[in-house]
Amino acid sequence: MKIVLDTNVLVMALRSRRGASFRVLSELPTNDFQIVLTIPLYTEYQDVLSRSEVLELGYTQNDIKELTRYLASISHKQEIYYLWRPWLKDPKDDMVLEAAFASQSKYIVTYNSKDFVGKGIEESFGIKPLNAKDFLIEIGKLN
């Protein structure tokens, strides 16, 4: 099963090793799900995770580079041939949706689910937006 991780899930995983986001990353690699990456999404991961507010958590640029390279090494690389813009308010969210649609992902794991829910994504594309905790519950990894 393929999933797309919104960048905010990675930020939350770096902020706390006790939260559901860190648990999702800790499951990797797994036979239960595979993360999907596109070039724009990978670039956003690098950009956001390299910002001062993330680095101030005690990470170095090298740590971020290692994390993003690791994610790329275990991910399903997806090319985007058709842009669904504008479908959502935020073009960055459209980028996540495009990755999920093109890869036929079942889930978008995000903390901005309000930006995805009620927009016809689940009904039109069969893609369910969930936060990290609800995703882990959904796949039976958390009670």
Placement of each model-derived feature along the sequence:
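Short, well-structured N-terminal submotif of metal-dependent ribonuclease cores
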Residues: 1-37
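Acidic, PIN/NYN-like endoribonuclease modules and their adjacent C-terminal/linker elements
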Residues: 101-107, 113-143
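Short, glycine/charged-enriched secondary-structure capping and boundary segments
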Residues: 17-25, 50-51, 122-125
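Active-site neighborhoods of divalent-metal-dependent phosphate/nucleic-acid chemistry enzymes
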Residues: 73-109
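PIN-domain endoribonuclease scaffold, especially VapC-family toxins
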Residues: 27-83
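A secondary-structure boundary/capping signal
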Residues: 6-7, 37-38, 112, 131-132
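Short, flexible helix/strand-to-coil boundary loops that buttress conserved ligand/catalytic motifs
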Residues: 14-15, 49, 120, 140
